[in-house]
């Protein structure tokens, strides 16, 4: 089987951030990305929302436990996140080239 995955290059304009995900919405810092792409990895069920001053709720996009995803993203925005239910864990956010 051949691996056709393209390697991910971290965008030097934004230092990757790791945050604790809990039962209250929290935000990343402002994310600068030249490619318009961000990579998000979570260790717990987490809901996420993008925007200039977002607040995440349990109605927003759900990322399941131990999931990694790449999203199109508007440079200059932030990512809000909140845990799903009583669990807690971490979210890692990286801008990619």
PLM regions: where:
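Viral virion structural and adsorption modules
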Residues: 1-4, 96-97
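Surface-exposed ligand/attachment interfaces on beta-rich extracellular proteins
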Residues: 3-6, 10-34
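Short, solvent-exposed S/T- and G/P-enriched segments that are highly enriched in secreted/extracellular
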Residues: 21-28, 58-72
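Noncatalytic modules at the cell exterior or secretory-pathway interfaces
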Residues: 35-38, 72-88
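General beta-strand recognition
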Residues: 39, 47-49, 80, 92
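Short, surface-exposed beta-strand/strand-loop-strand elements in extracellular ectodomains
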Residues: 41-59
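Short beta-strand-to-coil "C-cap" segments at the C-terminal boundary of structured domains/repeats
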Residues: 51-52, 94-97
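Edge beta-strands of jelly-roll/beta-sandwich modules across compartments, strongly enriched
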Residues: 87-95
């Amino acid at each position: 089987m051949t691996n056709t995955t393209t390697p991910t290059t971290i965008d030097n304009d934004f230092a990757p951030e790791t945050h604790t995900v809990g039962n209250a919405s929290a935000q990343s810092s402002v994310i600068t990305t030249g490619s318009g792409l961000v990579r998000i990895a979570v260790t717990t069920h987490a809901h996420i929302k993008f925007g200039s001053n977002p607040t995440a709720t349990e109605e927003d996009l759900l990322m399941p436990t131990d999931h990694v995803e790449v999203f199109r993203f508007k440079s200059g925005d932030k990512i809000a996140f909140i845990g799903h239910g009583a669990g807690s864990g971490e979210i890692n956010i990286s801008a990619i080239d």
